[in-house]
Amino acid sequence: MKYSVIDISSSSISMIAADVTANAAEIVYKDRASLTLLHYLEGKSLSARGIDKLVEAVMVMKGKCVSLGVDILYLIATASLRAAENFEQVRAELLERTGLPVNLIDGPTEAYCDYIANRFYSSYERAALLDIGGASIEVCDLSEDNRENMISLDVGIFDLHKKFVKEIH
């Protein structure tokens, strides 16, 4: 069976497709497109233009899933949409215009997903993972399978840039 996940983040939309059997998952396709949703915020709400850009990007990725013969497709979103005050409107627009329900991943689950995706990549006995995203930062202790050692901070690189960078030369 072929599965795919389309991931809406603060600075991009990405897709991964895999052939999954009882014993293994083989990645057959990956793609990423730049889309900085934070540029489309009006206050703390995603603008109509931002929603249109998001729908367009999701439809492009969904089309690739159709071309690949994907059986099951998940659309997920993290901090970029967690922070949007009009998330329910964005969710409804995405469902109506793409046919895909949005699975909103909360901060602790995002940190746990980072842990699961990276736990076998450490060659050190004690290692930490720092995932610096556009709207959140996740920190995981890769040496322990304990959710209490995984955190998600509601601050990201765009927040840090806004606070600490006055100008770029």
Residue ranges and their predicted role:
Residues L100-A111:
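A short, structured active-site edge motif that brings together acidic residues
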Residues Q89-V102:
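Phosphate/adenylate-binding "loop-and-lid" substructures adjacent to NTP/NAD/dNTP-binding pockets
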Residues K53-K64:
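Short, well-ordered amphipathic alpha-helical segments that serve as non-catalytic structural scaffolds
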Residues G63-A92:
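Short beta-strand-loop/turn "lid" adjacent to the catalytic site in phosphate-handling enzymes
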Residues A111-R119:
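Glycine-rich phosphate-binding/hydrolytic loop that grips phosphoryl groups
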Residues S11-R49, S143-H169:
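Short glycine-rich, Thr/Ser-proximal phosphate-binding strand/loop in the N-terminal lobe
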Residues S45-D52, R97-G99:
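Glycine-rich phosphate-binding "P-loop"
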Residues M1-A25, N118-L153:
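Gly/Thr-rich phosphate-binding beta-strand-loop-beta motif of the actin/hexokinase/Hsp70
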